[in-house]
């Protein structure tokens, strides 16, 4: 196999978090006194760091975005994190990859404590060597920063490590750290988005992903 270590994104790659994230965003909009958006318009928030997306999508200042995050977490931290569904077959896929000798990690822009709770709740934590996420104080949120932290903390060789994710932020963050990235097409990023960002390969489903990782 070309790779020894695999860094998995969480949202849109291991689980589909749309219901919980969008419900939390709607809660934040109500608390901010904003009009509540149609659910589909909020899918753009799935994947990238929230603060920068609040600013770019809602036109908030940094201070307003910080407050929006507080309101978002009121819902997400209690209910939203479990309004979430693992992709069908993901457990079997991870078990097979682990059995093949690959070392699996999670690298996510979601706060690390919340990520651990989600993975444990859905019985997925057992497949991973470790979980690298963002910090609750927003000091480490960009995907490149999270990947750099994972590589350094777990002493992973970039030439033996690959990122797997569904958005351009996964690809860009991987490339910033000298990693290939395999883009998955069952999440929230399009073929065009992932290709333009420079994905090394694309997988339409878990079967294709498993084959690419084991090749």
Predicted feature residues:
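Substrate-recognition element of Asp-dependent hydrolases with the DxDx(T/V) motif
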Residues: 25, 90-119
């Amino acid at each position: 196999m070309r790779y020894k270590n695999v860094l998995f994104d969480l949202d849109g790659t291991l689980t589909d978090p749309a219901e919980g994230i969008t419900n939390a965003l709607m809660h934040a909009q109500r608390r901010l006194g904003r009009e509540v958006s149609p659910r589909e318009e909020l899918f753009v928030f799935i994947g990238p760091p929230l603060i920068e997306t609040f600013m770019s999508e809602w036109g908030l200042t940094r201070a307003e975005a910080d407050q929006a995050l507080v309101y978002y977490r009121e819902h997400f931290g209690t209910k939203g994190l479990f309004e979430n569904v693992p992709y069908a077959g993901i457990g079997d896929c991870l078990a097979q990859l682990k059995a093949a000798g690959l070392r699996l990690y999670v690298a996510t822009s979601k706060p690390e404590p919340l990520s651990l709770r989600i993975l444990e709740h859905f019985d997925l934590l057992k497949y991973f060597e470790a979980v690298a996420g963002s910090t609750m104080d927003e000091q480490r949120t960009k995907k490149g920063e999270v990947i750099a932290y994972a590589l350094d903390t777990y002493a992973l060789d970039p030439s033996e490590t690959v990122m797997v994710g569904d958005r351009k932020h996964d690809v860009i963050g991987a490339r910033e750290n000298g990693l290939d990235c395999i883009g998955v097409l069952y999440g929230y990023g399009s073929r065009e988005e992932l290709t333009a960002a420079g994905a090394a390969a694309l997988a339409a489903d878990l079967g294709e992903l498993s084959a690419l990782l084991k090749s």
